[in-house]
A protein has these predicted regions:
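N-terminal catalytic or cofactor-binding beta/alpha core of small enzyme domains
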Residues: 1-66, 125
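Internal, conserved structured core segments that host functional sites
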Residues: 46-96
Length: 203
């Protein structure tokens, strides 16, 4: 259920409307499940780099006020198509909560950028407990396998909930087939593109 709206400085002043309703709402909202004691931050717009710092400071202050444990999520490019690794990072004293999870420590030095990076940075600077999860995913297509791995190995155990991920497997097959069709069309288009090439001498 809708719990609160974010009116942080730097966010675009736009109105979001939905199907089957006449009302509008702000683009960045917080939804709550009181029974499970869960909060979800949803944004219908991209947060621009110029607004990320202001937004992160605004939201992090609210996290501290309500004593929430934020879970930040970002993606990194898959190393192969066979595995989906999930890596964990933490701020404050939350690192110990990663020990019992099926997530790896990052195998190399890296940077979390964008709005998620700004949120993690603000949590660290304010000594706020938070967990960050970096999941291997496709940079070009929706990746249900990555979503499934993230939910089952990170979100479910931390939040103590169960999520039905069967639909994600079905979507993974659909997306895989769509990717193959797209690759075939791209190859066919490439074969037909304009080009110049030598054909040998003739008289």
């Amino acid at each position: 259920a809708h719990y609160a709206s974010c009116h942080c400085k730097g966010l675009p002043e736009v109105a979001v409307y939905d199907a089957d309703g006449h009302g509008v709402e702000p683009p960045v909202r917080i939804h709550a499940d009181e029974r499970r004691n869960l909060l979800v931050l949803q944004s219908d717009i991209p947060i621009s780099p110029s607004a990320a710092e202001e937004f992160a400071g605004c939201v992090t202050g609210w996290f501290a006020e309500v004593d929430a444990l934020p879970l930040f999520v970002t993606g990194t490019q898959r190393r192969d198509q066979e595995t989906t690794d999930v890596f964990g990072i933490a701020t404050g004293d939350a690192g110990s909560r990663l020990d019992d999870l099926d997530v790896k420590t990052p195998g190399e030095r890296g940077v979390v950028s964008g709005p998620t990076g700004a949120l993690v940075y603000q949590a660290s600077m304010n000594d706020l407990d938070s967990l960050g999860f970096i999941v291997e995913a496709s940079p070009q297509f929706p990746d249900p396998a990555a979503a499934k791995a993230l939910l089952e190995r990170a979100v479910e155990p931390v939040a103590d909930i169960e999520v039905d991920t069967d639909a994600l497997i079905e979507r993974a097959q659909e997306i895989s087939e769509a990717k193959e069709k797209l690759a075939k069309r791209m190859q066919e288009a490439g074969d037909e593109r304009s080009q110049a090439q030598p054909v040998g001498m003739f008289q």
